[in-house]
Amino acid sequence: VRLTSRDASLTNQDLSMSDRSLRATATTAAAAAAVVFAGPALAQSTIDKMKQFKVATTDLNIPTVQQGGPNAEAIRNNLKKIKLPEGFRIDLFAIVPDARHMAVGPSTNMLFVGTRKTTVWAVTDRNSDNVADEVKSFAPSLGFKVPNGVCWTKDGFLIVVEHNRVLNFPAAEFFYEGPDVAVIEVAGQGKLIPPEEESFNHGARTCRVGDDGKLYITLGQPFNVQGKDKVAMYEQIGIGGMVRMNPFDGSGREVVAKGVRNSVGMDINPKDKTVWFTDNQTDGMGDDTPPGELNRITKPGGGGEHFGYPYIHGNNVQIAGTAAAPDLKDMKPPAAWTKPQVEFPAHQAQLGMTFYNGKQFPAKYQGGIFVAAHGSWNRTKASGGLIDFVSLKADGSADKHEVFAEGFLDPETGSYRGRPVDVAVWKDGSILVSDDYAGAIYRISYRP
């Protein structure tokens, strides 16, 4: 049975919250629907035209999102309840419906934001005051499907990873004003995973381009725990793990991590170039087990480093043979499986992460990791809705972790004021935090 992930954001509460931004996104939804419901043939015709720099649409009315009004004021009031270390403050950077993973533009004051729906947002701070001036739909003629993952190549090409397609936009920062944008198909529709393995569950991808020039992509597996018949196939394909490939044509694909349940966040340490990722673990085993994970890939070759799932969670929580996975009772992890760098409290749903390489924050944060905890969805008492900070040792391994920002979860009512998804370092060394529940992006800055 496929179960809803704790990463799922379409709860009844979320739907009511989304009503506030419905008017702002209605035009976007209509434009996307025109492509999606016209069928695959029209969608492919559109991308074929864009690959050849031809006009795919004559509609220049690109949907934008209002940045002021009652919704913005309500969000600002909620931000007054967020607790931060001394000297830090949090402000509203932009209203961005369904905001998920972020990619800060390398050449401009722009931010590209993925969603779990049908839109990628282009966010612009034109006057460099660290507040967005414009939020508009990016490449609306394409008709995206769960374009959650966004990242940059070394030469400034924007990668968008959908549920089962990977696109490369060579000049996203400069051609975003129009509905048609030059595009390269890295992996065409149905080529990232076998179409028969597509699912509504655990389908949000994330990406980074490594120091080796390869595109790294996380691939969640769709079950709470996959059946015995799926284990070997998933490990071979990279479902429930991570793959890497050429970011321009998808060639040279290989599995670099397996034994992963559902990673929805990754980053690369700029110092030693190792790849790190979060992993959300099995539901239904209890409120306080199993722990969430922060992992580090140290042996990417040889068919992929194994991180224990679906046999063991964390350092020693058994899953194979338990009520969650009875048909795996005779299966064991490889002898050399890799333990997590950090165990997080169970079901907090740590998602996006970033290494802090800015210069604004105090020395203790330099080179460390900020991690967004989306918050639990099926725990008896809700947990999460915060930003963690993980410091590193001299050898590059994880040292300590602590809560950096909290208050997105109301401790008295157990309801969410916001649900952090991703963290990114902004131009001035502050950090941005996306929130798909409030439909916003926040900026956390420091002043002694």
Model-derived features: where do they sit?
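Short loop/turn segments immediately following the C-termini of beta-strands
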Residues: S107, T115-R116, H163-R165, A171, ...
